[in-house]
UniProtKB/Swiss-Prot annotation:
Gene Ontology, cellular component aspect: host cell membrane; membrane
Entry's localization field: Host membrane
Domain of life (superkingdom): Viruses
Protein name per UniProt: Putative transmembrane protein ORF80
Main localisation: host cell
Membrane protein topology class: Multi-pass membrane protein
Transmembrane region(s): 5-25, 55-75
Length: 80
């Protein structure tokens, strides 16, 4: 299989993963917000902080991967 096709598929997969990750965190934040509105417990605050940490870390890794795949695709296109 052509390496450019593989890299392009990796790029599309990265974008899809970012969309799915964002949707998952948004749904999780909605549940945490509902819990906070009814009862602002220490557990809800902890879950909110944890969700924010997961969000930041996840996006960091996803965007680093996306940038890496994009750079690899550009380098491959210039060599051919």
């Amino acid at each position: 299989m052509n390496p450019a096709v593989v890299l392009f598929l990796a790029l599309i997969t990265s974008i899809i993963l970012i969309i799915l990750f964002t949707a998952t965190i948004a749904i999780y934040h909605d549940f945490v917000t509902i819990e906070q509105n009814y009862n602002m417990t220490a557990y809800a605050q902890q879950q909110n902080t944890q969700a924010n940490n997961v969000l930041v870390t996840g996006f960091r890794f996803l965007f680093i991967g996306l940038i890496g795949v994009t750079i690899a695709l550009i380098i491959y296109q210039r060599r051919t």
